């Protein structure tokens, strides 16, 4: 009889169609594969092509399973990721995603994995897994504080909060003092997203069923960082909740020459140690023209070196590039963010505060400057700011407007002013927590022990 502690598991991974979800799922896949387990990573053709190439020692352990995304009305051709469609088309992408149920069910029936680890959008998956006798875990890319703010699965399914004001106060199930709430201008976007759209199912309901019908919940964080929130989360969910650590960023060797990185590195190499502010607001957010203008003028006024990444070509102020030439670099399109954040000349990170970016930035000890734009980013900002980690750009509470002075002041505080010394020191301390690979591996080891003890009886 094979010892359960030595048994090789077959684990299927099914992330939502966004790079900010695909990459952490792949990171966890690699860590499980390094422990000797077999992984089936399921997504669409274009998303799989976008993923970084596997190291040769993992190629035999991770199999990419590709399902074409069914075409639907309202979704532009070749749109397979949230980065391919505007914000107001996200629900159309989910409608196409929901049509993957038949091929996914057939694959699971044929391959009989021991576990399937899934994302929030596939609320229909747990019932399929249960029918096939496959153990199922919801992998949350949100931290424990955000999950607690969202509440127990029943509150999500019943959608008990519906107005912006409902989201700007601490919910009744949080029994201790908390600053984890949305600002009004943040929540107006969030509440819009909870409404039913072309799929007939809101994001709130998707989350609720994904949590409620799971056998366990895996969380990309750890109790050392948010102890009170993990304790509350276990009370709210009443099922196994496992921290998996931060899945810290790793710079992998790549034989291919990355011409984009070569050009960026050449510029960064010329800058002083910890002098550069890296500016990136994610792949999904689209800033209005006036916001781009104020952000640009704020970077100019800060008199600090900066590297600014934009997803598409915006209209920046006339003469801006000329005035900041040599001190600032503007790049349109994809960049190797982990490599940039690892560079010694980068000291600060003006970020939308998506959890992936938070982990990557603090994993290298970079000081965050918060500019939340969408989704749970405001909650992440409150969590970090409450711990003295970083500075938030001042904005109008109602409409989210800001001016160039608030941008410049935030940058100078983090990068130059004596008053920011404590903030800079705390970010460096966080590097030992967010970037500690050994400590994070310990959480993955505990996760594997649990999965082995609870997995299905299907063959590997």
UniProtKB/Swiss-Prot annotation:
The keyword Transferase applies. It comes from Arabidopsis thaliana. Keywords: Glycosyltransferase, Transferase. The gene is UGT91C1. This is UDP-glycosyltransferase 91C1. One of its GO terms (molecular function) is UDP-glucosyltransferase activity. It holds the Pfam family UDPGT. It is an enzyme of class 2 (transferase). UDP-alpha-D-glucose binds at residues 283, 335-337, 352-360, 374-377. The keyword Glycosyltransferase applies. Its EC number is 2.4.1.-. Belongs to the UDP-glycosyltransferase family. Gene3D superfamilies: Glycogen Phosphorylase B (3.40.50.2000). InterPro entries: UDP-glycosyltransf_plant, UDP_glucos_trans.
């Amino acid at each position: 009889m094979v010892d359960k502690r030595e048994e090789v598991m077959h684990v299927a991974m099914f992330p939502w169609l966004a790079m900010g979800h695909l990459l952490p799922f792949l990171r966890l896949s690699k860590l499980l594969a390094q422990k000797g387990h077999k992984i089936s990573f399921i997504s669409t053709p274009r998303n799989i092509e976008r993923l970084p190439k596997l190291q040769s020692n993992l190629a035999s352990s991770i199999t990419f399973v590709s399902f074409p995304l069914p075409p639907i009305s309202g979704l532009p051709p070749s749109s397979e990721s949230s980065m391919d469609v505007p914000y107001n088309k996200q629900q159309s992408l989910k409608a196409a995603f929901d049509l993957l149920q038949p091929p996914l069910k057939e694959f699971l029936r044929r391959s009989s994995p021991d576990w399937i680890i899934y994302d929030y959008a596939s609320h229909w998956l747990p019932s399929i897994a249960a029918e096939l006798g496959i153990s199922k875990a919801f992998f949350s890319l949100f931290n424990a504080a955000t999950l607690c703010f969202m509440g127990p699965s029943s509150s999500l399914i019943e959608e008990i909060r519906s107005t912006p004001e409902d989201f700007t106060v601490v919910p009744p199930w949080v029994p201790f003092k908390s600053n984890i709430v949305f600002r009004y201008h943040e929540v107006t976007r969030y509440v819009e997203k909870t409404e039913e759209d072309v799929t007939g199912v809101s994001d709130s309901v998707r989350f609720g069923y994904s949590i409620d019908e799971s056998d366990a919940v895996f969380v990309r964080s750890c109790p050392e960082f948010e102890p009170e929130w993990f304790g509350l989360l276990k009370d709210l969910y009443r099922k196994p909740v496992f921290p998996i650590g931060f899945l810290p960023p790793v710079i992998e060797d790549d034989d291919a020459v990355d011409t984009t990185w070569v050009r960026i590195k050449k510029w960064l190499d010329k800058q002083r140690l910890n002098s550069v502010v890296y500016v990136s607001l994610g792949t999904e957010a689209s800033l209005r023209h006036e916001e781009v203008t104020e952000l640009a003028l704020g970077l100019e006024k800060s008199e600090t070196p900066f590297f600014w990444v934009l997803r598409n070509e915006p209209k920046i102020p006339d003469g801006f590039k000329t005035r900041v030439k040599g001190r600032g670099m503007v790049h349109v399109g994809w960049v190797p963010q982990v490599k940039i954040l690892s560079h010694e000349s980068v000291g600060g990170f003006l970020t939308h505060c998506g959890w992936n970016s938070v982990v990557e930035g603090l994993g290298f000890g970079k000081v965050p400057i918060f500019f939340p734009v969408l989704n749970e980013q405001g909650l992440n900002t409150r969590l970090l700011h409450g711990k003295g980690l970083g500075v938030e750009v001042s904005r109008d509470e109602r409409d989210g407007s800001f001016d160039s002075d608030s941008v410049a002041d935030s940058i100078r505080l983090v990068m130059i002013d004596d008053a920011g010394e404590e903030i800079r020191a705390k970010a460096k301390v966080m590097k030992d927590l967010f970037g500690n690979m050994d400590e994070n591996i310990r959480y993955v080891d505990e996760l594997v022990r649990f999965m082995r003890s609870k997995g299905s009886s299907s063959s590997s």
